[in-house]
C-alpha cells in the first residue's frame, strides 16, 4: 500500500528535551491531544487545558501513563480572561517557565449565513478568533523570559471558500492575520509566532459538527483521498515550535494534500 495513503507514526527524537509547553484544548482525541502526546514523545513537559473537567482528567491520566515528561493541566474556557490568567499562573507554578504555547482551541459548525443566528455566529468568533487573541496576549509576557514560541491552529478555510462555513472561515482568517501582525510585534523580544492551516483533519469533533456526506465529499477532494490523521497535523505544530523553524515567524503553513 502507498505510504502516503497509510502514513507511519514517527519516532521521537528529543526535539523538546526539558522544554515546557502549554497546549490549549488538548483533551479528547483530536489535534490537541495528539499534539500533547507528540510533545511528550519529543522530551517535553506539558501543561494542557480543556473546557470539560472529565475529559481533561482522562487526557491527563492517559498522557501520564506514557511515563515520559511531566504532565499537568487545568480547566480553561478561552473566552474567559480570568480563566486564561489562572491557567498561565498554574503552568508557571508547575514548571517555573514556558518555552512554547500551542493555541489550539476552536469551534466550528455547518450553517448557511441566511439561516445562521447571531448567537451561532458570535460563539464561533468568540471561541475561535477572540480566544486565540486572548491566549496570545497572555502568552507574550510569559514567553519573553525564554524567547519562546506561539503556534496557532488556523485552517485552509482562511483562504478557501466553502458553503456553510462563513463563521468558521472568517474566524480562522482572523487567526492568520493575528499570526502575521503580532509576529511583527514580538520580534524584538525573540518570540516567534507561526500557524498551521489544516485542510481536513479527522477527529470526533469534525463528525459532530459536519454531516457524513460533507466529510465524504471533502475527503474525496484531497489528493490522497483521505483526511489527515490528527498526529500528522501535530507534527507540523511541533516543527513550528522547534528550533528547526528558527528563521520562520509570521508564517502560515498549509497542511494539505491539495485538491485532486
At which residue positions do the language-model features occur?
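Short C-terminal tail/terminal secondary-structure segment
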Residues: 2-11, 30, 160, 220, ...
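Short, small/polar-rich loop/turn modules that mediate ligand/substrate recognition or access, typified
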Residues: 102, 187, 192, 248-250
Amino acid at each position: 500500500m502507498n505510504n502516503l495513503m497509510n502514513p507511519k507514526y514517527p519516532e521521537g527524537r528529543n526535539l523538546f528535551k526539558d522544554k515546557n509547553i502549554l497546549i490549549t484544548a488538548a483533551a479528547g482525541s483530536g489535534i490537541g491531544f495528539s499534539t500533547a502526546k507528540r510533545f511528550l514523545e519529543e522530551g517535553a513537559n506539558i501543561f494542557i487545558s480543556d473546557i470539560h473537567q472529565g475529559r481533561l482528567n482522562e487526557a491527563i491520566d492517559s498522557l501520564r501513563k506514557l511515563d515520559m515528561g511531566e504532565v499537568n493541566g487545568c480547566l480553561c474556557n478561552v473566552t474567559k480572561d480570568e480563566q486564561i490568567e489562572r491557567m498561565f499562573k498554574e503552568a508557571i507554578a508547575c514548571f517555573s517557565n514556558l518555552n512554547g504555547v500551542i493555541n489550539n482551541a476552536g469551534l466550528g459548525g455547518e450553517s448557511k449565513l441566511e439561516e445562521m443566528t447571531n448567537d451561532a455566529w458570535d460563539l464561533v468568533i468568540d471561541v475561535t478568533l477572540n480566544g486565540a487573541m486572548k491566549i496570545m496576549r497572555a502568552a507574550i509576557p510569559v514567553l519573553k523570559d525564554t524567547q519562546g514560541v506561539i503556534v496557532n491552529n488556523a485552517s485552509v478555510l482562511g483562504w478557501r471558500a466553502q458553503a456553510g462555513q462563513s463563521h468558521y472561515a472568517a474566524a480562522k482568517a482572523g487567526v492568520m492575520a493575528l499570526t502575521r501582525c503580532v509576529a511583527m510585534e514580538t520580534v524584538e523580544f525573540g518570540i516567534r509566532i507561526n500557524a498551521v492551516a489544516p485542510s481536513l483533519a479527522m477527529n470526533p469533533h469534525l463528525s459532530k459538527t459536519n454531516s457524513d456526506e460533507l466529510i465524504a465529499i471533502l475527503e474525496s477532494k484531497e489528493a490522497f483521498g483521505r483526511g489527515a490523521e490528527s498526529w500528522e497535523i501535530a507534527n507540523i505544530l511541533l516543527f513550528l515550535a522547534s528550533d528547526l523553524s528558527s528563521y520562520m515567524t509570521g508564517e502560515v503553513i498549509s497542511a494539505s494534500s491539495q485538491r485532486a
